[in-house]
């Protein structure tokens, strides 16, 4: 039994199983025993097997024959076990001159042990003989058989085994004695500890008596603390060592988990790549759809702009018509006044009133058309605002989709780069592993080559010795033959009997010489054959070594190429990162440009909204002008007639409209005003105006309506410009110097300001409350709800109220 030195075998998988007593050659058809040792680094399994492989195998399937490895009895995990397998002779290979080796293969197909190479050769008489030096320190060589040599070795090993067993028994006895001593020492230590505790208790009791005992007690405490600290330190060291072992195990488990996670993440990344490709296609389709929608929205915006231009042209046209109608109305009022001055007949007044009513109907119709056009304009502006908002949201969605598409493309590129890098890493790892395997095989082949070379040198020495021995034997034989010839020549003439005897003796040395020559020739032939075989095997091994070197060079070149490819991939990854940074910068610039466009569009929308408000305010001012003209013309006539003393009697029944008012249903008011119908229109009394300018003539404002017309905003409720004329005729312009009408418009002011008391209101103050505050300063007629300025003459106001009770004036319900 050969002893072997323990080394850290966990570094190589081929050293987890060690094969013992492997010979250099075995008989082909004889039973073969395989001795091997299972190290603590392998866990046996019933499906493990030992196979005979030809040298140069690549996988576990290249076995020649195999036997199942038996499960060792009473196996303890982490211990070494010796096992034996017996291969039957008819399963073994023949004498083919190839090298074989034992390999231990696990149930997972992993090769965990390999033996030294050996051959299967038939025994020859020369091979059974061995030469060895004499143990008696003599220069002679002793020729023995292999069996004898092996028996001697077995006897020596058995003796060594017996000696080792005796030594083991002695060592076991010594260990038992040492264990008993350790137990005794531990008991003594425990006894001493108990005694120490007792002494400490006694010392604590005596501390109150003497100060010296206190000092000794402190010294004992210090010693005890040192011992305990050492014990704690040792315990901590033990705990740290155990923690390190546990950490190593956890690191191994974590590495396994990381490997599993990496495989799982690889599968997830492949799935994610597929999904991202699908999302990329969907993004492309969505991008195309959004571009189509953008084009549609742009076309709709263009059509709405065209409609807006058409509406503006229609509004300008109607404004021109309103101006023309105002001029016509002014001319008609002038004609009415001239007719009132020239004639006082009822028929003329009826005709003039009829014309005035028709003009008022036309003005009212145009006013309703203006209101409808304002509604349509507001609807068009709202539609345009909605389309602009939709366009803005579509652009934002488009930019968002583009950003997502760019991010997806970048992620795809990064994933592709990561996968390529992983592939290169795995390939590099595999190539390195193959190079290490080839280096190991080269080392094994070199060792085998050295052994064969040494054997060849030894055989060459034996051949030289045999040739020297044969030459010496030939020289001795020739000397003997020469001496014998001389003796024969000397005794020829003496006795014929002796000559006959010499003749009879002569053939015996020739036969011995012939036998010796035959034996030496046979040995020389066998030695030459063996030398030829050895040289052939040497050449084969040399060729294999050269092939392995060529393969190593080839793999080294491939490794260099793979490193170059990896560097190129790294450069490509850096370029891709730079491109991504440039794309991000361009995208940020595009975002800034889009923000500028959005800000420009918002400013444009604000300008459009301001223009819209200006248009509405202008329309409202035009409406107020028309209302002021319609209401101020009879009021001026009334005041002039009152001052001159002329009162015209009007019939109680108002004329009915010839074609009716087509906008009567839409002209309804809320509150106390009610609806204006032709038969319910009430006017103040009219008298002949006098053009004297001595007294102050006040043109009162029309009655203010507390309700808003349909389709108009709060900021555009019935307001009138302060600089607007009260009447279009020259007399009204002259009267403007004595009394002016009240008008305010809050759409142009940031804060609302009362024009009478100078009180400021916030911009978001309710318009109806603001109007109530302003109206509270005015004098209101309790009958007709007509408003008068605060500085209006009280007597004139009372006279106005009294006119409602006159018999010649229409009653106001």
UniProtKB/Swiss-Prot annotation:
Organism the protein comes from: Pongo abelii
Name this protein carries in UniProt: Tax1-binding protein 1 homolog
Subcellular location: Cytoplasm; Mitochondrion; Preautophagosomal structure; Cytoplasmic vesicle, Autophagosome
Binding, Zn(2+) 1: 754, 757, 773, 777
The record's note on its domains: The C-terminal UBZ-type zinc fingers function as ubiquitin-binding domains.
Alphabetical UniProt keywords: Apoptosis, Coiled coil, Cytoplasm, Cytoplasmic vesicle, Metal-binding, Mitochondrion, Phosphoprotein, Repeat, Zinc, Zinc-finger
Zinc fingers (UBZ1-type) by residue: 751-777, 778-804
A molecular-function term among this protein's GO annotations: zinc ion binding
Residue ranges the record marks as coiled coil: 144-627
Biased composition (Polar residues): 489-502
Residues that bear Phosphoserine: 124, 138, 225, 617, 633, 690
Keyword Acyltransferase in annotation: no
Principal localisation: cytoplasm
Function: Ubiquitin-binding adapter that participates in inflammatory, antiviral and innate immune processes as well as selective autophagy regulation. Plays a key role in the negative regulation of NF-kappa-B and IRF3 signalings by acting as an adapter for the ubiquitin-editing enzyme A20/TNFAIP3 to bind and inactivate its substrates. Disrupts the interactions between the E3 ubiquitin ligase TRAF3 and TBK1/IKBKE to attenuate 'Lys63'-linked polyubiquitination of TBK1 and thereby IFN-beta production.
GN (gene name): TAX1BP1
Subunit-structure text: Homooligomer. Interacts with TNFAIP3. Interacts with STARD13. Interacts with MYO6. Interacts with TOM1; the interaction is indirect and is mediated by MYO6, which acts as a bridge between TOM1 and TAX1BP1. Interacts with MAVS; this interaction induces MAVS polyubiquitination. Interacts with TNIP1. Interacts with TRAF6; this interaction mediates deubiquitination of TRAF6 and inhibition of NF-kappa-B activation. Interacts with RIPK1; this interaction negatively regulates RIPK1 ubiquitination. Interacts with NBR1. Interacts with TBK1. Interacts with RB1CC1. Interacts with SQSTM1.
GO biological process: apoptotic process; negative regulation of apoptotic process
Annotated signal sequence range: none
């Amino acid at each position: 039994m050969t002893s072997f030195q323990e080394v850290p075998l966990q570094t190589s998988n081929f050293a987890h199983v060690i094969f013992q007593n492997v010979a250099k050659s075995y008989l082909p058809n004889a039973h073969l025993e395989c001795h091997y040792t299972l190290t603590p680094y392998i866990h046996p399994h019933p499906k493990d097997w030992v196979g005979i492989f030809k040298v140069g195998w690549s996988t576990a399937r290249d076995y020649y024959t195999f036997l199942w490895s038996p499960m060792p009895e009473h196996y303890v995990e982490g211990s070494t076990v010796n096992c034996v397998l017996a291969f039957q002779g008819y399963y073994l290979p023949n004498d083919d001159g190839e090298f074989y080796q034992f390999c231990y293969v696990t149930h997972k197909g992993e090769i965990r042990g390999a033996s030294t190479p050996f051959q299967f050769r038939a025994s020859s008489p020369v091979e059974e003989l061995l030469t060895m030096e004499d143990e008696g320190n003599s220069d002679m060589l002793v020729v023995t058989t292999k069996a004898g040599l092996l028996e001697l070795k077995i006897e020596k090993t058995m003796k060594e085994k017996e000696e080792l067993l005796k030594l083991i028994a002695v060592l076991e006895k010594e260990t038992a004695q040492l264990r008993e001593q350790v137990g005794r020492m531990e008991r003594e230590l425990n006894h001493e500890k108990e005694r120490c505790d007792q002494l400490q208790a006694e010392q604590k009791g005596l501390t109150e008596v003497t100060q010296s005992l206190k000092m000794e007690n402190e010294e004992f405490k210090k010693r005890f603390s040192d011992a305990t600290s050492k014990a704690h330190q040792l315990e901590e060291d033990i705990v740290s060592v155990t923690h390190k072992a546990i950490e190593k195990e956890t690191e191994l488990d974590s590495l396994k988990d990381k490997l599993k996670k990496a495989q799982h993440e690889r599968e997830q990344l492949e799935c994610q790549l597929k999904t991202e490709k699908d999302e990329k296609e969907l993004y492309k389709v969505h991008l195309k759809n959004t571009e189509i929608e953008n084009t549609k929205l742009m076309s709709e915006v263009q059509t709405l702009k065209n409609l807006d231009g058409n509406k503006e042209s229609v509004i300008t046209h109607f404004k021109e018509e309103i101006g023309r109608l105002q001029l016509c109305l002014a001319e008609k009022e002038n004609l009415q006044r001239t007719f009132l001055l020239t004639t006082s007949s009822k028929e003329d007044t009826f005709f003039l009133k009829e014309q005035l009513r028709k003009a008022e109907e036309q003005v009212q119709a145009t006013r309703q058309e203006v209101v409808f056009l304002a509604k349509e304009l507001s609807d068009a502006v709202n539609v345009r605002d909605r389309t602009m908002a939709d366009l803005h949201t579509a652009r934002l969605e488009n930019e968002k989709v583009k950003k997502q598409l760019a991010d997806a493309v970048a992620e795809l590129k990064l994933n592709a780069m990561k996968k390529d890098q992983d592939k290169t890493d795995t390939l590099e790892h595999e190539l390195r592993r193959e190079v290490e395997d080839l280096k190991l095989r080269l080392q094994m082949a070199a060792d085998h080559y050295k052994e064969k070379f040494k054997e060849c040198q030894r055989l060459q020495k034996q051949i030289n010795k045999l040739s020297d021995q044969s030459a010496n034997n030939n020289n001795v034989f020739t000397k003997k033959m020469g001496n014998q010839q001389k003796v024969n020549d000397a005794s020829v003439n003496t006795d014929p009997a002796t000559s006959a005897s010499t003749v009879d003796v002569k053939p015996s040395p020739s036969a011995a010489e012939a036998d010796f020559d035959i034996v030496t020739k046979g040995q020389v032939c066998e030695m030459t054959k063996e030398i030829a075989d050895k040289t052939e095997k040497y050449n084969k091994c040399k060729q294999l070594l050269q092939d392995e070197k060529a393969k190593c060079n080839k793999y080294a070149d491939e490794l260099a190429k793979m490193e170059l490819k990896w560097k190129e991939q790294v450069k490509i990854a850096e370029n891709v990162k730079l491109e991504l940074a440039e794309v991000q910068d361009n995208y940020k610039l595009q975002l800034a440009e889009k923000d500028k466009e959005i800000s420009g569009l918002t400013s444009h929308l604000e300008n459009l909204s301001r223009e819209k408000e200006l248009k509405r305010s202008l329309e409202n001012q035009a409406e107020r002008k028309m209302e002021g003209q319609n209401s101020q013309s009879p009021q001026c006539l009334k005041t002039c007639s009152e001052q001159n003393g002329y009162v015209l009697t009007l019939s109680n029944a108002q004329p009915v409209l010839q074609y009716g008012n087509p906008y009567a249903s839409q002209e309804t008011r809320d509150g106390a005003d009610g609806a204006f119908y032709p038969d319910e229109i009430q006017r103040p009394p009219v008298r002949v105006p006098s053009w004297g300018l001595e007294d102050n003539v006040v043109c009162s404002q029309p009655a203010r309506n507390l309700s808003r017309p349909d389709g108009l905003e709060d900021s555009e409720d019935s307001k009138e410009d302060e600089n607007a004329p009260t009447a279009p005729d020259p007399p009204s312009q002259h009267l403007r110097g004595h009394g002016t009408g009240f008008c305010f418009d809050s759409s142009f002011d940031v804060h609302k300001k009362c024009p009478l008391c100078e009180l400021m209101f916030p911009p978001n103050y309710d318009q109806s409350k603001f109007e109530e505050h302003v109206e509270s300063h005015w004098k209101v007629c309790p009958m007709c709800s007509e408003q008068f300025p605060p500085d209006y003459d009280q007597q004139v106001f009372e006279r106005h109220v009294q006119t409602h009770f006159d018999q010649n004036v229409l009653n106001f319900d």
